[in-house]
């Protein structure tokens, strides 16, 4: 029997006007963790969709050999029956069902159409123990954090007798502790004989867990690296991904910082459902003209709640405090008023809240300010095309046409469309919530350049990020949050990862001590 559990030979996949995969060869050894790297749009997800049957046999050229047998999958069910299970970046769990119901949904423990709940619960307990979860099988999935939901997804895969587990950006939405737990679980499952493919832009995680790394660029296989025998560094992986040396992760910049243009004063917000729970407690911060201000904090610190509540009170209840712009108190009591006052918010969830995926690039970009391209309440379509093409060219959005649906774009290009949409609204204050989440290093550099250009044009930038190197590399000044409070303010010159982490873990009790 071959040492390879999977061989994909000469895989070519075309879409109208685009060759997404071009004669790709990809092999995975039995019992290894194999990382798949590449820029957004390199073809990683397309290759995995070919493998799992999302793109059925006949819609691509090439051959798939799994456990020595040639496979012609017509759908996901067929690939899962052989033990190939994919966990997508957007988790496929139902929040209002229990853990047990989610794990065995479509794979029920039933006889003559009647579910055996005793067996279901017993097997769920075993699976939860295997992935390190102590929750009850009856717990609703919606009550779990994202990190634990990822573990439920893995338990669901194990319930299907998985032989090859595919993880697409498994830690993109996780904090450091949850990421560490998931990676340790993956290593433990490897010891038990599981083979895995991991797609991730977090190169430090890849080099930690992977046995082999295959790099794709522009739909082609560039190289496969063996972690034991090849000299593998993050710089080498990046060079393979982008086709050049990326000596600096962050563009060089000499900031031109002016006067204070935006202030948040004594901003307090309560939870929208649990009305006695204070989510933000007397937040005070300021942004100067041309300044990039960072917000650092662990998950649950209140960073996104702060951003959304400032942006038209789109989160929270019993909100008190004041927002000042250019020395004048402004009304941000709803989103339209926030936009009218020159505030824009780039959400952390671009697919869920930032874009209309079924619409084209043109309509997504101009949506934030239709009045700018309208005459007597009628949209001037020619002007709409001109404006959207201007942003496409300026931000190098990779697309054959502004009429292309946004859902067909890579993550990096989708993020450029979101940024274009809000820049089209001509804001003075731009709030960026995880602006490079799920984006490769090359596209990140382009996004960083756009952010710096906005600051250089005199905009005030409030940037939220869970990646401390990103905060340190991009921001002129940093506020740190913990438990809904600001626990420190650090200048760029004073900031270190250690100092930020100390402030991120500071509790109200410690502050009062």
UniProtKB/Swiss-Prot annotation:
Its EC number is 7.5.2.12. Part of the binding-protein-dependent transport system for L-arabinose. Probably responsible for energy coupling to the transport system. This is L-arabinose transport ATP-binding protein AraG. Residues 6-243, 264-508 form the ABC transporter domain. GO terms for cellular component: plasma membrane. It holds the Pfam family ABC_tran. It comes from the Bacteria. InterPro entries: AAA+_ATPase, ABC_carbohydrate_import_ATPase, ABC_transporter-like_ATP-bd, ABC_transporter-like_CS, L-arabinose_ABC_transporter, P-loop_NTPase. Keywords: ATP-binding, Cell membrane, Membrane, Nucleotide-binding, Repeat, Sugar transport, Translocase, Transport. It comes from Geobacillus stearothermophilus. ATP binds at residues 38-45. Its main location: membrane. One of its GO terms (molecular function) is ATP binding. It is a peripheral membrane protein. It catalyses: L-arabinose(out) + ATP + H2O = L-arabinose(in) + ADP + phosphate + H(+). Gene3D superfamilies: P-loop containing nucleotide triphosphate hydrolases. The lineage of its organism: Bacteria, Bacillati, Bacillota, Bacilli, Bacillales. Belongs to the ABC transporter superfamily. It is an enzyme of class 7 (translocase). It is found in: Cell membrane.
């Amino acid at each position: 029997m071959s040492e390879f559990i999977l061989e994909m030979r000469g895989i070519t996949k075309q879409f109208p006007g685009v060759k997404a995969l071009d004669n790709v060869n990809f092999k995975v050894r039995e019992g290894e963790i194999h990382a798949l790297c590449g820029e957004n749009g390199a073809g990683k997800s397309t290759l995995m969709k070919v493998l799992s049957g999302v793109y059925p046999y006949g819609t691509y050229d090439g051959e798939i050999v799994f456990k020595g047998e040639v496979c012609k999958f017509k759908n996901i069910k067929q690939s899962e029956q052989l033990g190939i299970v994919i966990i997508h970046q957007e988790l496929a769990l139902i929040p209002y069902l229990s853990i047990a119901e989610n794990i065995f949904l479509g794979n029920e423990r039933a006889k003559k159409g009647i579910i055996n709940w005793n067996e279901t619960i017993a097997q769920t307990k075993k699976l939860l123990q295997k992935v390190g979860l102590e929750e009850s099988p009856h717990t609703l999935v919606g009550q779990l954090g994202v990190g634990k939901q990822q573990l439920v997804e893995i338990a669901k895969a194990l319930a299907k007798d998985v032989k090859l587990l595919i993880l697409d950006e498994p830690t993109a939405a996780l904090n450091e502790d949850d990421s560490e737990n998931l990676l340790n679980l993956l290593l433990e499952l490897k010891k038990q004989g599981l083979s895995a493919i991991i797609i991730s832009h977090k190169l430090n995680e890849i080099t930690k867990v992977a046995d082999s790394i295959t790099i794709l660029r522009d739909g082609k296989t560039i190289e496969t690296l063996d972690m034991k025998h090849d000299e593998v560094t993050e710089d080498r992986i990046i060079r393979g991904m982008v086709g050049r040396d990326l000596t600096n992760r962050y563009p060089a910049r000499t900031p031109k910082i002016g006067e204070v243009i935006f202030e948040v004063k004594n901003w307090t917000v309560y939870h929208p459902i649990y009305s006695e729970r204070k989510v933000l407690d007397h937040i005070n911060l300021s942004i100067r003209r041309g300044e990039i201000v960072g917000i650092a904090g662990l998950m649950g610190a209140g960073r996104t709640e702060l951003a959304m509540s400032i942006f038209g009170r789109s989160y929270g209840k019993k909100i008190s405090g004041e927002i000042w712009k250019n020395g004048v108190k402004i009304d941000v009591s709803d989103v339209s008023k926030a936009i009218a006052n020159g505030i824009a918010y780039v959400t952390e969830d671009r697919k869920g809240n930032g874009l209309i995926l079924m619409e084209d690039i043109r309509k997504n970009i101009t949506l934030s300010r239709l009045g700018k391209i309208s005459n007597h309440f009628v949209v001037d379509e020619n002007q709409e095309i001109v404006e959207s093409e201007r942003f496409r060219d300026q931000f190098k959005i990779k697309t054959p046409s502004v009429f292309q649906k946004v859902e067909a774009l890579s993550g990096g290009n989708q993020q450029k469309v979101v940024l274009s949409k809000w820049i089209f609204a001509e804001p003075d204050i731009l709030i960026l919530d995880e602006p490079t989440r799920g984006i490769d290093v090359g596209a990140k550099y382009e996004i960083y350049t756009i952010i710096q250009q906005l600051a250089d044009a005199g905009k005030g930038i409030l940037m939220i990020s869970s990646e401390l190197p990103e905060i340190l590399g991009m921001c002129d000044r940093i506020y740190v949050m913990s438990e809904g409070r600001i626990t420190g303010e650090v200048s760029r010159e004073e900031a270190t990862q250690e100092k930020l982490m100390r402030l991120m873990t500071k509790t109200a009790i410690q502050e009062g001590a």
